[in-house]
A protein has these predicted regions:
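Glycine-rich His-Gly loop
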Residues: 7-8, 141
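Conserved nucleotide-sugar donor-interacting segment of glycosyltransferase catalytic cores
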Residues: 116-158
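A short acidic (Asp/Glu
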Residues: 14, 56-59, 146-151
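Conserved dinucleotide-binding and phosphotransfer motif residues
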Residues: 32-33, 40
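A short, glycine/small-residue-rich beta-strand->loop->alpha-helix junction that serves as a flexible
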Residues: 8-21, 54-57
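A conserved catalytic-core segment of Leloir-type glycosyltransferases
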Residues: 37-39, 45-130
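Short amphipathic alpha-helix
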Residues: 18-30
Length: 158
């Protein structure tokens, strides 16, 4: 069971090469799982922020669950939606730090940090909320670094 977490995934959101990888790598591994053999047991899933620019696209989504993310001030709700991207189950993480940002990346580093810390922490809690065990957490670039750092605090680490 592999969970990819990424700030971009083409065709939903692509600013640069990270969007290419976020869209193509999970899809390529998913297609291997459909071929059978040694890869047939792969369960590939992807999580990306549910940016406002994705919300205005006409893609089918369904609400899955809410997760409370602890912050220094008070818990913030992360709402998790599901869609499919090239056959890959894709989770869209929504919540105040992500919702208030019109752009994927802004010039305000504090706002970007809050957005991606929130996203990373939500992704760590996502498998538990889904009753799904993750064997490998594939974190892409600095936007998901907090998730890797916080793995040490999880009782059942991927």
């Amino acid at each position: 069971n592999i969970l990819f977490i990424c700030s971009e995934a083409d065709p939903l959101v692509k600013i640069g090469g990270l969007g290419d990888v976020g869209g193509a790598l999970p899809a390529a591994l998913h297609s291997l799982s459909k071929e059978g053999g040694n890869y047939s047991s792969l369960d590939i899933r992807l999580a990306i922020p549910y940016y406002p620019k994705i919300k205005i696209q006409d893609i089918p989504t369904r609400f899955i669950t809410s997760i409370k993310i602890k912050t220094a001030e008070s818990p913030v709700e992360a709402r998790i939606f599901e869609t499919s991207l090239s056959g890959v189950t894709t989770y869209l993480v929504s919540g105040e730090p992500i919702d208030r940002s019109e752009m994927v990346y802004g010039l305000d580093f504090k706002t970007d940090a809050e957005k991606f810390i929130f996203f990373s922490l939500a992704c760590l809690q996502l498998p538990h909320a889904l009753h799904w065990t993750v064997d490998i957490l594939h974190a892409n670039d600095w936007h998901t670094a907090v998730a890797v750092h916080q793995l040490k605090d999880l009782p059942n680490k991927p």
